[in-house]
Amino acid sequence: MALADFALVVGIDSYPGLRPLKGAEADARDFYDWVTDPAGGNVDAQNAKRIVTSDFAPLADSADGAKPVRDHIEDFFKMVNKAAARNAQAQQGIAAGRRIYLFFSGHGFSPSLDRSGVLMANATDDMPFNIGAQMWADRLYDGGWFEEVLLFQDACRQHFPSADVTPPFFQSRNPPQDPPRKRFYAFSAKSGLLAVERPLANGHTRGVFTSTLLEGLRLGAVDAPSGDVTTNQLKVYLESNMQKKLTDVELEDADISKVPEVSHADPFVIVAGRPGAPRTNATFPVELRSAAPGKILNNDFEVVAENFTGPPPWTAKLQRGLYQYVLPGGGTTLFKVTGALDASQQPVVTIVSV
């Protein structure tokens, strides 16, 4: 029998002991909708746990009574461990499931380059109660609780050297090497930098990372030939598109992360292609600026556009990927079509100047 997939989705807006957030719960709800959608993550709702601020209404006025706290998140991991025990008893191996999605949106911190924590609702400046999201992902991966581990964290990663991340309570274990395990981690900010939430085109406040992430997962990060949403394409999509949602002021702020931190980006399919899936062969505008028209070659050195007529600039529509613009005299310019979208969700024109 095939192993099940799991998902933990956490979004915390209310921090009585810190600055409140406006978009973390909305981010979590949107991710939960995607991860339980049969056309998205396809995780059975009985294996998906969503924990958000409004679950604990009326909200506490002080940090002492604020929720969710670490116990609420750790209850999910207890369920995971029980699933692994059931599978072992049924002689299905020691894994709890095939894949797990871990999504966290809220305040966060990073005491060092290799550690990252998400603050719980009862956190204060002098009592940073937290969950070690990255450490949990590492423990589930290293111990073979899942074959595939995906971690998405939309939270700041400011350095607090005096604070430490709360480690997992699972004991380390050495799993069999087969089947080979894979993982993919993406953080909204690089270590030491801030993440941003802001009103987007629809007027709703959202994390710019989560908004970009879900665009990619909803077939924006499709591998054109296969129709699959892959980790490779999602990495490119996140690194190319998140900064498009930042304002000019935010782009100039040295404390704000312009691109996400993507690590352990093992190659695998996140969402398998489906016949007729939208945007599988999506094309994006390219503007060519040169003295004379040339031709465009793809990564396999095949001509994909030529015979441009009329005065410059010339235009073309291309799928995501790497290309060469070759001029009649032999000059060559490399360029990439990323599929980036602007704040109104319209494709950004790739300009190629020679």
What annotation goes with each model-predicted range?
Residues 1-20:
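Short glycine-rich His-centered loop
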Residues 300-312:
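Short, acidic Ser/Thr/Gly-rich low-complexity loop/linker segments typical of extracellular
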Residues 66-166:
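Caspase-like (clan CD) cysteine peptidase catalytic core
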Residues 320-331:
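A short, solvent-exposed beta-strand micro-motif common in secreted/extracellular proteins
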Residues 7, 95, 222-302:
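Caspase-like cysteine protease fold
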Residues 28, 33-97:
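Functional beta-strand-loop-alpha-helix junction segments that form "active/interaction loops"
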Residues 260-263, 330-354:
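Structured interaction patches on ligand/partner-binding surfaces of diverse proteins
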Residues 11, 22, 28, 35, ...:
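Active-site-proximal C-terminal subdomain of hydrolase catalytic domains
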